[in-house]
Design a protein with these regions (language model features):
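Conserved NAD(P)+-binding/catalytic subdomain of aldehyde/semialdehyde dehydrogenases
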Residues: 176-250, 254-266
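A glycine- and small/hydrophobic-rich beta-loop-beta segment
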Residues: 257, 261, 269-344
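C-terminal core of ALDH-fold dehydrogenases
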Residues: 320-434
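Flexible, glycine/charged-enriched surface loops at secondary-structure junctions
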Residues: 99-104, 265-270, 290-300, 328-331, ...
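N-terminal Rossmann-like NAD(P)+-binding subdomain of aldehyde/semialdehyde dehydrogenases
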Residues: 1-120
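Short acidic-hydrophobic, aromatic-tinged amphipathic segments that line or gate anion-handling sites
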Residues: 1-7, 179-184, 306-311
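Conserved small-residue-rich beta-alpha loop and adjacent elements
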Residues: 104-170
C-alpha cells in the first residue's frame, strides 16, 4: 500500500508510472520493411505474411459474402440477441452525436459556414488472438454506419480454416461492413493504408492491436500517401476510486476485469480507506483463483498499485495525475465529484457501473485513449468518422466592409500578393461605384 501524502512530487510520478512501451529501433525497422514489401508486392506480400503467421493454406484475402452469411448464421440466439442489444445502444448514443452545420454572418456581407461530411473510406482492424472481439467490431462499425461512411472494410486474421469467428461475421454484417479481408498485423495496416489489388485504400484506419500494429499505424499516418489513424495506443488500464462505502468484491472484480486483458494491463486502486484497500486485495486473491484467464491476470495484478489517500479530494488528485483510460468511481454520491474529475477516457459512475458495461453494451465507445493520452485525446466518437470544412462567401458589400482590415493585416505580415488580391477587388468596386 502506498500512502500518497507521504510521497514527494517525483515519488508520486513514479507511483503512477506506466511501463515503457515497445519503441525499439528493431521494431521500427521490421514494421518499415513489412510496409515497404506490401507497397511493392501488394497482395502477394500480404498473403505470404498471413500464411506465415496465421493460416498456412490461405488462398485468398477476401472472405466471400457466402462465407460471411454462413458464419453469421452459426451465432447462437443468445449471443445474437446480446450483439443486437449492444448494437442498438451504441447506435442510439452515436446518433445523438450527429453535429449540425453552422451558417452565420460575421460582418455585413460576409457569410461563414461550417459543414460536416462522412469520411468516404474507413478501414477497421479487429485483432485475432484467443477470443473473438465482436464488441470491437460494433465500436468501430456502428459509428462508421451512423456517420454515413460509404466504404467500410474490415481486416482480421483468419483461423487455420481460412475463416473468422462467427460472432465477428455477425457483428460486421449488422454494421453494414462492405468487405472483410483475411489478414492481420502490420501487413493488414499497410494494405489498408496503401491499397492492393484486393484491399482498397482507405482514408482512415481504426482499431487496436499489438506493438506491430501500433507501430504500423504510426508509420502510415506519417506518409503523405498513407492514411490517418484514430489515436495512439498503449496497454489497457483502469483506475478505481473508492471510499469506505464501496463494496470490496465489486472493486476486486473491476480490477481483475482489466487485468485479464493482458499481463501488461494496468490496475490501480486509490482510496481514502485502508480497510477498503486491504479487503479489496483479499477479494482479488479469492476471485483470481476462479478465473479461466488467471495466468494472464496474475502478472498484471502483481504489478497493481494500491494507493491510500487522506481524502477523496486527494484521491481525485492522484486520478487526475494518472489520466486513466477507464475510471471507475465507487464513492458515495459519486456524481457530486464529477466536476473535480479532469482527465479520463471514460468514467463509470457508482457501484452499478462496471467497466464491462462500457466495454460491451451501455452505448458509449470502448475505444479510449490510454497511456496518459486522456489528458489531450478523447474517446472515439462519431466525429472521428467525419471531417469538417468551412465556407466563406463575401458579397460586394462584404468586401467593402472587410477589405481594409484584410489589407492592413496582409501588409503587416509583408504578404504583398495577399494585399493585392483584395486591393484589386476594392479598386474594381470603386470604379463600379463611380
Amino acid at each position: 500500500m502506498i500512502t500518497w501524502s507521504s510521497l514527494s512530487v517525483n515519488e508520486k510520478k513514479q507511483a503512477l508510472a506506466r511501463p515503457a512501451m515497445a519503441n525499439s529501433q528493431q521494431l521500427k525497422q521490421t514494421v518499415g520493411d513489412i510496409i515497404a514489401r506490401v507497397e511493392k508486392e501488394g497482395d502477394e506480400a500480404v498473403l505470404d505474411y498471413t500464411r506465415k503467421f496465421d493460416c498456412p493454406d490461405l488462398t485468398s484475402l477476401v472472405l466471400s459474402q457466402e462465407n460471411i452469411d454462413a458464419l453469421a448464421a452459426k451465432v447462437t440466439p443468445e449471443v445474437a440477441s446480446a450483439i443486437d442489444t449492444a448494437f442498438n445502444n451504441i447506435k442510439m448514443f452515436h446518433e445523438a452525436q450527429m453535429p449540425s452545420d453552422i451558417a452565420l454572418t460575421t460582418t455585413p456581407g460576409v457569410k461563414c459556414e461550417l459543414r460536416f461530411t462522412a469520411l468516404d473510406a474507413v478501414g477497421l482492424y479487429i485483432p485475432g488472438g484467443s477470443a473473438p472481439l465482436p464488441s470491437t467490431v460494433l465500436m468501430l462499425g456502428v459509428p462508421a454506419l451512423v456517420a454515413g461512411c460509404e466504404n467500410k472494410l474490415l481486416c482480421t486474421p483468419p483461423n487455420k480454416e481460412q475463416l473468422i469467428a462467427p460472432e465477428i461475421a455477425y457483428a460486421a454484417r449488422k454494421c453494414g461492413i462492405d468487405k472483410i479481408f483475411l489478414c492481420g498485423g502490420a501487413q493488414a495496416i499497410a494494405a489498408m493504408a496503401l491499397g492492393t489489388d484486393s484491399v482498397p485504400q482507405v482514408d482512415k484506419i481504426f482499431g487496436p492491436g499489438n506493438s506491430f500494429v501500433t507501430e504500423a499505424k504510426q508509420q502510415v499516418s506519417q506518409r503523405a500517401d498513407g492514411a490517418a489513424i484514430d489515436m495512439p495506443a498503449g496497454p489497457s488500464e483502469v483506475l478505481v476510486l473508492a471510499d469506505e462505502f464501496a463494496n470490496p468484491e465489486f472493486v476486486a472484480a473491476d480490477l481483475l476485469s482489466q487485468a485479464e486483458h493482458g499481463p501488461d494491463s494496468q490496475a490501480i486502486l486509490v482510496s481514502n480507506s485502508a480497510t477498503l484497500i486491504e479487503e479489496s486485495k483479499a477479494a482479488v486473491e479469492r476471485q483470481l483463483a476462479t478465473l479461466s484467464r488467471a495466468e494472464i491476470a496474475r502478472p498484471a495484478m502483481e504489478n497493481a498499485r494500491y494507493i491510500l489517500a487522506d481524502s477523496i479530494e486527494q484521491a481525485i488528485e492522484a486520478s487526475n495525475a494518472y489520466a486513466a483510460e477507464h475510471l471507475i468511481v465507487q464513492i458515495e454520491n459519486a456524481r457530486d465529484y464529477l466536476p473535480k474529475i479532469k482527465y479520463a477516457g471514460s468514467i463509470f459512475l457508482g457501484p452499478w457501473s462496471p467497466e464491462s458495461a462500457g466495454d460491451y453494451a451501455s452505448g458509449t465507445n470502448h475505444v479510449l485513449p490510454t497511456y496518459g493520452y486522456a489528458k489531450n485525446y478523447s474517446s472515439l466518437g462519431l466525429l472521428d468518422f467525419m471531417r469538417r470544412y468551412t465556407i466563406q462567401e463575401l458579397s460586394a458589400d462584404g468586401m467593402r466592409n472587410l477589405g481594409p482590415a484584410i489589407m492592413a493585416l496582409a501588409a503587416a505580415e509583408g504578404l504583398d500578393a495577399h494585399e493585392q488580391a483584395v486591393a484589386l477587388r476594392m479598386q474594381a468596386l470603386k470604379q463600379g461605384d463611380a
